[in-house]
Amino acid sequence: MNLLTGRNMVERSSKFLFIVVGSVLFMLILYQYVAPGMMNFGSPHGYMLEDDADLFPTPDPHYVKKFYFPIRDLERTVDFEIKGDDVIVFLHIQKTGGTTFGRHLVQNVRLEVPCDCRPGQKKCTCYRPNRKETWLFSRFSTGWSCGLHADWTELTNCVPGVLNKKESRMKNQRKFYYITLLRDPVSRYLSEWRHVQRGATWKTSLHMCDGRTPTPEELPPCYEGTDWSGCTLQQFMDCPYNLANNRQVRMLADLSLVGCYNMSFIPEKKRAQVLLESAKKNLRDMAFFGLTEFQRKTQYLFERTFRLKFIRPFMQYNSTRAAGVDLDNDTIQRIEELNDLDMQLYDYARDLFQQRYMYKRQLERREQRLKNQPLFPFRRTSSSDSTFRDDAPESEGSRLPTEDYMNHIINRW
């Protein structure tokens, strides 16, 4: 009798244990089935991959690639050591939205030790967590230490020496990660014209190259007097020395290759070709670049490149001074001709940017699927993977003139 009673108790315990285990497994599978995207088992570097689904647009499955880029040009994840000697260097091209992005770098990055930005001061202190040395070289951290809107030629020759002087010691082990923003050339050109029309000059820019600044003969002014305020668009376009023409190519290229600002160094056609190819190479080799017209994708690529997370999402604002300019087709064509090198560079950069975004998103999703597959083989694909699309402001097919959005962002913050 006792033997039968013991056997019954064992059978009941086994059944109870089976029911409990089965219920737990069923609930886990059901949870994954009805609520995919709700569970996160700790993505690397603090990324909430599933939560990002609503923030970052899906790559266009119908996007047609224009250029071939090997994997080494698409993969842009760097081992940025903020506690080491690594430095991010921001090359700020005029009227590309760089003011907004620069503010993001000093005010909107989630850091162990945030940048110290005090009211009334133009610069923030961005120290490493473990010592009083800067990890960021930019307008809002170190100021215009290499000159106002210093270009690639100036920065690469100036930054190491400036940091050695600031930190009072020589360092040969620093890694410099150059970053920049590009913008649709016509929109950028119009924005610069409106800025100059209001009195901006940038005449304190050094334009240092091969150890010297350009002579007045090499770089004649477009106007007489203190500024060019009130100039018409026609006057702006008519000046052959206007640095607004092809500004993005000039600021990204190695000017030493073409004799700096000496136009007689090599023939004009050869000079243009060398500048364009140099700008493409330097852009391709940079740790990161973004496009003003694609704020969310720019945020995504920066975060994945440096494994740094922004606190608040980037906003896409398209109501700018450039947007309010009504132009006829002839004027637009003339601006495109004056900025032919920039048009070619932007076409190249936009394709590289989109391919990098697609590559990184696909890689991330593959990693997520592999991570979830062993645990939940019956998991249904998240509907968010196929339903969310590019947000309207990041339209692929139209020109979206965007520039400095800080007033909007400050109000929202």
Curated annotation (Swiss-Prot):
Pfam families assigned: Sulfotransfer_2 (PF03567)
Residues the record lists as binding substrate: K122, K123, R139, W144, H149, H195, W202
Query: Which parts of the chain does the record assign to the membrane side Lumenal?
Result: 37-413
Report the membrane topology from the UniProt record. Answer: Single-pass type II membrane protein
Q: Where is the active site?
A: H149 (proton acceptor)
Q: In which tissues is it expressed?
A: During somitogenesis, first expressed in polster and presumptive forebrain. During mid-somitogenesis, expressed in eye, hindbrain and anterior spinal cord. During late somitogenesis, strong expression in eye and hindbrain, decreased levels in midbrain and anterior spinal cord. At 24 hours post-fertilization (hpf), expressed in neural retina and lens, brain and anterior spinal cord. At 36 hpf, retinal expression is confined to the ciliary marginal zone and there is strong expression in tectum, rhombomeres and otic vesicle.
Note down the stretches annotated as region Disordered.
Answer: 374-401
Q: Which GO terms describe its cellular component?
A: membrane
Q: Where does this protein chiefly localize? A: membrane
Q: Which residues form a coiled coil?
A: none
* Domain of life of the source: Eukaryota
Q: Which residues are glycosylated?
A: N262, N318, N329
User: Which residues make up the binding site for 3'-phosphoadenylyl sulfate?
Assistant: 92-100, 183, 191, 315-317, 321-322
What sections of the protein cross the membrane? Answer: 16-36
Stated EC number for the protein is 2.8.2.-
Which molecular-function annotation in GO is an example for this chain? heparan sulfate 6-sulfotransferase activity
Record localization = Membrane
Keywords noted in UniProt: Glycoprotein, Membrane, Signal-anchor, Transferase, Transmembrane, Transmembrane helix
What family is this protein classified in?
A: Belongs to the sulfotransferase 6 family.
Q: What is this protein called?
A: Heparan-sulfate 6-O-sulfotransferase 1-A
